[in-house]
């Protein structure tokens, strides 16, 4: 049985870890691909074996969480639209509040990714979220 200390992160895991730190510290625009690969201990060529741009790397770090929270919102919105008008009026506050609470819980459970989206994404497709 392998000891936890014997398990080494994969190249992709090292790239993701280094990129997350770099983006959180400097934002997307200030982040250096050179620093990311150096911190990850890989070559630029190895990086380009996985991603063809810094933006694709950023997207890989946050797209799952972004899509999930948008799906939560759209699903709640669609369910609300299916209610009869009087039920919409009677339940608007509760439905909206419940959705917001679930979204905030999800954001806290994925704090680094949402810090990237909300505070470090200038220059990416997420900057106006």
Question: Model segments located where?
Answer:
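Flexible coil/turn residues that form the inter-helical turn or adjacent wing/linker of helix-turn-helix
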Residues: 29-30, 50
């Amino acid at each position: 049985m392998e000891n936890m200390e014997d398990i080494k992160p994969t190249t992709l895991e090292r790239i993701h870890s280094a990129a997350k730190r770099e983006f959180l510290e400097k934002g997307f625009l200030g982040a250096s691909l050179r620093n990311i690969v150096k911190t990850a201990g890989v070559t630029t060529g190895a990086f380009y074996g996985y991603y063809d741009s810094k933006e694709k790397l950023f997207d890989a770090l946050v797209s799952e969480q972004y899509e999930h929270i948008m799906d939560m919102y759209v699903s709640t919105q669609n369910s609300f639209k299916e209610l009869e008008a009087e039920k919409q009026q009677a339940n608007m506050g509760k439905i909206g509040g419940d959705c917001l609470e679930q979204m905030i819980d999800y954001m806290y459970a994925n704090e680094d990714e949402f810090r990237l989206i909300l505070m470090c994404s200038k220059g990416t497709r997420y900057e106006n979220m």
